[in-house]
Amino acid sequence: MNIWTCKRWEKYYSDNNVRMGIRLRIEKTVTFEVRRALKEFTAWMRKKYSFPIRIPVYVKSSERIKARDGDIVCATFFEPDDKYVEPYIKIATGDYFELERTDGRDNALAAILGSLIHELTHYYQWINCINLTEVGRERQANAYTGIILGEYAKTREHP
């Protein structure tokens, strides 16, 4: 079962009773290359996957962000208790130039896209009511990061 294409969510969202789709909210100070890569990747995802309840993605120019639990992280997913409240994702991209310097442009962009994929996997776990332990959730998110990045890589030469 591919949780990105699983339709368990239909019992909640099939009546068009919520806003749908994925929306990027990118800070003006986010570098052009990161902005471009995220927009292209999001356009590709919209064609390939369903987003039955809107998932805003807040893209920050800082190196880290604070999660709701107070942890300082690179990316986070807010999972509401109510299935009709929109979740959201926040991603920090301020370490792009350091990643580019150490790993190269393509790997730096892939790392940022990977963070988005990881958090979107948590979105799909949430909408499809996938019950796993915390370790299981993270393992699954890490696995799907590689799977989705691999699918995307087949469609272009560079991220």
Task: Indicate residue ranges for each PLM-predicted region.
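Zn2+-dependent metallopeptidase catalytic core
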Residues: R35-R54
